[in-house]
């Protein structure tokens, strides 16, 4: 593989490994699942021996089961948003749900990205290196203004601290901790992660009447197929399912 890419083995990244496996698949007519499994096992062992971070590889010949995203109800969202004691954490949760942001997008959010006059949020170079704008609701704007007046951040909206106590962008673990703590204290039984809040944002917008193409742009998806999964979990009027037993004895 290193010879194929003409580089040092320890410099290989996930994308190169996946590309190489797809290359092997295209060369061989019927590669077995076990062939790719053992290829990946070998890669993982090599990573362990070399002391480098284990590569995350998608096996091209093995179809993963397609799971529908977890979606919270509106009542669960209301409960989650009012649970944190700190305003900073409530605002962070509000952005994850109210703007459909990814974890990294919340971390990298800067003061210059907030446009309160136009009620827009500028997401710079998110996943896929593509900027986008998402609407900022009045409730979020009020919360952000109150938080900014109290905390006075300089660059990033949400600061963390390095070992010397200097302000840096909040770590991924810091964002995830806020979500985890809110879930535990709220008593919600469903899985709640930053991405579950993003799924919930998308699903609720569809249920409120937003069209699928606009949702695609708000989420920053390149392929519409990625967005279409939310149609399967949305309770749209024309798609609301019911049990025939409920109507068997009704006139």
Regions found by a protein language model. Name each.
Residues 1-251:
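Conserved catalytic core of the tyrosine transesterase superfamily
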